[in-house]
Amino acid sequence: MSAANMPTTTGAQGSGNQVPTTSTTIVNHFRELIKEPKNLDEAANYLFQTLLDDAVVGIFNETHHLRKSGNLAALDGVPEDSTYRMCEMPNLDIFGISTAKKPMDCTCPNCDRLVAAARFAPHLEKCMGMGRISSRIASRRLATKEGATSAHLHSSGNTGGTDDEDDVDWSSDKRRKKSNQNSRNNGSKKNNGKTF
């Protein structure tokens, strides 16, 4: 069915009944009314009434369809009043979020001690033995343990030794010597200690 032949309902002039018509019928009836100059008021009223009826019936049908399909509530959306309400409860801010201080302590998974949140990462590093200082202590412990083991093996008369014991300890030769305080420039190369 084309748009020109779509059935619409119109109210007959002077009577209260609704007559289903098509748009071509409406246009033909309007042209007949315009032919005579004395019927122009009737033609204007007829055209207005037809357009109004068509718009009202269209809105009614669409609303009825949305209500029956359950989509009418989705068309309305969420009411805006609830988003701008202020909360006036004690210990809550205007958005309803608690203002009470939260405990800032963490429990260490390794030793089950309560540690302040700001100190948790350094504590966990030391507690698990993974920090920089812990690795240095572990290296020293291994070096002293190896030294005691090799001294024990040499004193017992075993001269065979393993390949690990024969290797040169590379880390002991590269230990950094402390610099003398007088030889430092404190970061400035200016004047080199000379006065002019």
Curated annotation (Swiss-Prot):
<comment type="similarity">
    <text>Belongs to the SGF11 family.</text>
</comment>
<dbReference type="GO" id="GO:0005654">
    <property type="term" value="C:nucleoplasm"/>
</dbReference>
<dbReference type="GO" id="GO:0045893">
    <property type="term" value="P:positive regulation of DNA-templated transcription"/>
</dbReference>
<dbReference type="Pfam" id="PF08209">
    <property type="entry name" value="Sgf11"/>
</dbReference>
<dbReference type="GO" id="GO:0008270">
    <property type="term" value="F:zinc ion binding"/>
</dbReference>
<dbReference type="GO" id="GO:0006325">
    <property type="term" value="P:chromatin organization"/>
</dbReference>
<dbReference type="InterPro" id="IPR051078">
    <property type="entry name" value="SGF11"/>
</dbReference>
<dbReference type="InterPro" id="IPR013246">
    <property type="entry name" value="SAGA_su_Sgf11"/>
</dbReference>
<dbReference type="GO" id="GO:0005643">
    <property type="term" value="C:nuclear pore"/>
</dbReference>
<comment type="function">
    <text>Component of the transcription regulatory histone acetylation (HAT) complex SAGA, a multiprotein complex that activates transcription by remodeling chromatin and mediating histone acetylation and deubiquitination. Within the SAGA complex, participates in a subcomplex that specifically deubiquitinates histone H2B. The SAGA complex is recruited to specific gene promoters by activators, where it is required for transcription. Required for nuclear receptor-mediated transactivation. Binds independently on SAGA to promoters in an RNA-dependent manner.</text>
</comment>
<keyword id="KW-0862">Zinc</keyword>
<keyword id="KW-0509">mRNA transport</keyword>
<dbReference type="GO" id="GO:0071819">
    <property type="term" value="C:DUBm complex"/>
</dbReference>
<keyword id="KW-0811">Translocation</keyword>
<feature type="modified residue" description="Phosphoserine">
    <location>
        <position position="172"/>
    </location>
</feature>
<keyword id="KW-0963">Cytoplasm</keyword>
<dbReference type="GO" id="GO:0000124">
    <property type="term" value="C:SAGA complex"/>
</dbReference>
<feature type="region of interest" description="Disordered">
    <location>
        <begin position="1"/>
        <end position="22"/>
    </location>
</feature>
<dbReference type="GO" id="GO:0003713">
    <property type="term" value="F:transcription coactivator activity"/>
</dbReference>
<keyword id="KW-0653">Protein transport</keyword>
<protein>
    <recommendedName>
        <fullName>SAGA-associated factor 11 homolog</fullName>
    </recommendedName>
</protein>
<keyword id="KW-0539">Nucleus</keyword>
<dbReference type="GO" id="GO:0015031">
    <property type="term" value="P:protein transport"/>
</dbReference>
<keyword id="KW-0805">Transcription regulation</keyword>
<keyword id="KW-0813">Transport</keyword>
<dbReference type="GO" id="GO:0005737">
    <property type="term" value="C:cytoplasm"/>
</dbReference>
<keyword id="KW-0479">Metal-binding</keyword>
<dbReference type="GO" id="GO:0006357">
    <property type="term" value="P:regulation of transcription by RNA polymerase II"/>
</dbReference>
<feature type="region of interest" description="Disordered">
    <location>
        <begin position="141"/>
        <end position="196"/>
    </location>
</feature>
<keyword id="KW-0156">Chromatin regulator</keyword>
<keyword id="KW-0804">Transcription</keyword>
<keyword id="KW-0010">Activator</keyword>
<dbReference type="GO" id="GO:0006406">
    <property type="term" value="P:mRNA export from nucleus"/>
</dbReference>
<comment type="subunit">
    <text>Component of some SAGA transcription coactivator-HAT complexes, at least composed of Ada2b, not/nonstop, Pcaf/Gcn5, Sgf11 and Spt3. Within the SAGA complex, Sgf11, e(y)2, and not/nonstop form an additional subcomplex of SAGA called the DUB module (deubiquitination module). Interacts directly with not/nonstop. Interacts with the AMEX complex component xmas-2. Interacts with Cbp80; important for promoter recruitment of Sgf11 that is not associated with the DUB module.</text>
</comment>
<feature type="compositionally biased region" description="Low complexity">
    <location>
        <begin position="180"/>
        <end position="196"/>
    </location>
</feature>
<feature type="zinc finger region" description="SGF11-type">
    <location>
        <begin position="106"/>
        <end position="127"/>
    </location>
</feature>
<keyword id="KW-0863">Zinc-finger</keyword>
<keyword id="KW-0597">Phosphoprotein</keyword>
